UniProtKB/Swiss-Prot annotation:
Cofactors named for this entry: Mg(2+); thiamine diphosphate
Keywords, comma-separated and alphabetical: Amino-acid biosynthesis, Branched-chain amino acid biosynthesis, Chloroplast, FAD, Flavoprotein, Magnesium, Metal-binding, Plastid, Thiamine pyrophosphate, Transferase
GO biological processes: isoleucine biosynthetic process; L-valine biosynthetic process
Protein name: Acetolactate synthase large subunit
Coiled-coil residues: none
Taxonomy of the source species: Eukaryota, Rhodophyta, Bangiophyceae, Bangiales, Bangiaceae
Length: 590
């Protein structure tokens, strides 16, 4: 490897750090320099000169953590971010927490004050090791540079093995500068028994699951982010092809199954499709693959899939039975489990019962009765129209989103491939979408990357336009601008007596077109149907970055919606269009 050509017998801790991450295949990091991490950035200068690695200079450390997160989600590799001590390190916390709850392997490397100053409340000293313990798989403080290579190797192992997640390495300034006789720990040399994925792939559980599938007349596959991480899309397709089982996904599982398929019901849960929610309420067998049974999916938990037996497959034993006790619990990787299950089903194939045909017909009727609707306004454009048109123009794009109404509409109306959907699901982090688009675009420089944001979310990290401009990243930014904190307004309207406390965003709102142009980024304002499609077409064709300020209907609500404390079958906003108003809507089935 190239890095071996510049190894001598005596090296510094900072050299050991960079050499170790390069040995693990890292070619991009996202970071921001500062006092305690300056020795590492000084070393980085030489490594970049040799084209061994490249730092993407973000405008805020939160942007670095989100970019590393999206880099990982879109590639399956470990994303790496750098920050200095104190406020630099604490600025990473939201991004680390986002990665933790969504099981994303990122490695956060922070500078720290020198060892003699730790515990003295030195300038920019913060116990980032302690702060991050609840939101990482593991944290390290490097006390001796001789441990650096081993710690990095362990960190990469921990990030990826078992249920993925973030790891933090805190590097005191003087550790980076200290010289020692360097010997590298190569990738693959580290084995940590506690991080090995547990597995109970016993023939008894697989056999029970197979029998339940063969006996079910109303089965449903409920698929989460664990299946994406496992790259299980091909094996899941085989299972669906064999037994014609309908598929619904979580927000994290979106893209695991062909969204144009007649068997795909789209997302379930609070803002899921009506037919997915009806299906989960009526199924007699729920096959959960890499999903957590979280509150946004289940609604009222004791009424979730209350008619169903449950098979739950997850790599994390802590998730199995946490919220819903399954009849069959299988701890293991989704691909491995479904492969074993499929082999057994093929060897003992029994034609699926005729009742499954009536189950499919029933779901088809729900689709026809309660489709997703795209409102067509006479004087303005709806958010749904923007998203449907964008998807038609960019069918193979990577989509990142922020959090709020636009995120839920995107989940409803965008059809994506596996690992092409990048969104903060568990933590719901506003400001995620723009830096996430940076990470995805750096990972896939020749692919189309689109950031769908809201006017409120966008303002959380809009400084990252500077990063996009600096590196000429051809990201397309679609702002769904309704001049509100849209989801907050919707909840205030529905549950807080229409008291709109601090959710209006008109006063002090920037002109997004001029803002982008100030960074040298091409921008359009889209405010009517006449210029909507042409502006979107021009944006997708343009070779550089583009921002579109899409000024949409202000008071559009995101439906269907399962209200707090209600079951998934008790959705609001799913009434069929009244007679005579059909021309005001376009049906959009997933």
């Amino acid at each position: 490897m190239l890095s071996k050509q510049i190894i001598g017998s005596e090296k510094t801790g900072r050299f050991a750090l960079l050499d170790s991450i390069v040995r693990h295949g890292v070619i991009h990091i996202f970071g921001y320099p500062g006092g305690a991490i300056l020795p590492i950035y000084d070393e980085l200068y030489a490594w970049e000169e040799l084209s061994l690695i490249k730092n993407i200079l973000v405008r805020h450390e939160q942007g670095a953590s989100h970019a590393a997160d999206a880099y990982s989600r879109s590639t399956g590799k470990v994303g790496v971010c750098f920050a200095t001590s104190g406020p630099g390190a604490t600025n990473l916390v939201s991004g680390i927490a986002t990665a933790h709850i969504d099981s994303v392997p990122i490695l956060a490397i922070t500078g720290q004050v020198g060892r003699p100053f730790i515990g003295t409340d030195a300038f920019q000293e913060v116990d980032i090791f302690g702060i991050t313990l609840p939101i990482v798989k593991h944290s390290y403080v490097v006390r001796d540079p001789r441990d650096m290579s081993r710690i990095v190797a362990e960190a990469f192992y921990i990030c990826k093995h078992g249920r993925p997640g973030p790891v933090l390495i805190d590097v005191p300034k003087d550790v980076g500068l200290e010289k020692f006789n360097y010997f590298s720990v190569e990738p693959g040399q580290v084995k940590i028994p506690g991080c090995r994925p547990l597995s109970n792939l016993k023939s008894r559980q697989i056999l029970m699951a197979a029998k339940m599938i063969q006996q079910s007349s109303q089965p449903l596959l409920y698929i989460g982010g664990g299946a994406i991480i496992s790259d299980a899309h091909s094996i899941i397709k085989e299972l669906v092809d064999l037994y014609k089982i309908p598929v619904t996904t979580t927000l994290m599982g979106k893209g695991i199954f062909n969204e144009d398929s007649e068997f795909c019901l789209g997302m379930l849960g609070m803002h899921g499709t009506a037919y997915a929610n009806f299906a989960v309420s009526e199924c007699d067998l729920l096959i959960a693959l890499g999903a957590r049974f979280d509150d946004r999916v289940t609604g009222k938990l004791d009424e979730f899939a209350c008619n169903a037996q449950v098979i739950h497959v997850d790599i994390d034993p802590a998730e199995v039975g946490k919220n819903r006790i399954p009849q069959v619990a299988i701890v293991g990787d989704v691909t491995e489990v479904v492969t074993s299950l499929l082999n057994l089903l093929k060897n003992n194939f029994k034609p699926y019962p005729e009742q499954i045909i009536s189950w499919q017909e029933r779901i088809h009727r729900w689709r026809q009765q309660y489709p997703l609707l795209v409102p067509k306004k006479s004087t303005s454009i709806s958010p749904q129209e923007i998203l449907v048109t964008t998807n038609q123009l960019a069918q193979d794009a990577y989509f990142t989103t922020d959090v709020g109404q636009h995120q839920m509409w995107s989940a409803q109306f965008l059809k994506v491939k596996s690992k092409h959907w990048i969104s903060s699901a568990g933590l719901g982090t506003m400001g995620y979408g723009l830096p996430a688009a940076i990470g995805a675009q750096v990972a896939h420089p020749n692919e189309l990357v689109i950031c769908v944001s809201g006017d409120s979310s966008f303002q959380m990290n809009m400084q990252e336009l500077g990063t996009i401009a600096q590196y000429k990243l051809p990201i397309k930014i679609v702002i769904i601008n309704n001049r509100w904190q849209g989801m907050v307004r919707q909840w205030q309207q529905a549950f807080y007596g229409e008291r709109y406390s601090h959710s209006r965003m008109t006063e002090g709102a920037p002109n997004f077109q001029k803002l982008a142009e100030a960074f040298g980024i091409k921008a359009f304002t889209v405010n009517n149907r006449q210029n909507m499609e042409s502006s979107l077409k021009d944006a997708m064709k343009y070779p550089g970055p583009v921002l579109l300020d899409c000024q949409v209907t202000e008071n559009e609500n995101c439906y269907p919606m399962v209200a707090p404390g209600k079951s998934n079958a008790q959705m609001i906003g799913i009434a069929k269009p009244q007679r005579g108003t059909a021309s005001n809507y376009v049906s959009r089935n997933i």
